[in-house]
Amino acid sequence: MTSEKYSRPRMLLHWCFAAIIVWASLSGFANTLLNLPEAISHGISFINVSLTTLLIPLFGARLYFALAHPVAEEPAQALHGAALLAKVGHLALYMAIGLVLLSGVLMMEHPIDFFGLLVLPQPLHEPLLTAFFNRVHRYACVALALLVVGHIGAVLIHQWRGHPVLRRMLP
């Protein structure tokens, strides 16, 4: 397995996405599944909408740097089934992130308040459409959470087997 590190922009974007996705997933599922007081529920929603709105332009940057700064593979690894699984897993993560972000915007039933600094208009006003995208968003969030758990599990398995892949994503 190659020991080449990811570029600094890729590392920074990865950990930024990781922190926000883990926070938004845990707090979002808690907000959905638990009977939280209304003030806490609204606070979580406000923070999650603001944080994930921040991810939208960063997602474009992340795609750019993934293509512009690829990490070299060892030739033997390129044909290995685990390498293909890793590529498919990462592609699924990117697709799920994109779907969660897009459906999150399209499900909004009110303007998007970005940390009280900027208010973006609600893109759709038809209740059937916002309800549809709300449903898509919920399923996409579950899929993303499962993919993140699988991603973390794969990293732990690699570490346990003596392949320190995590070191490639650390400064």
Language model region names:
Residues 1-171:
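Membrane-embedded alpha-helical bundles that constitute the cytochrome b-like, heme-associated redox core
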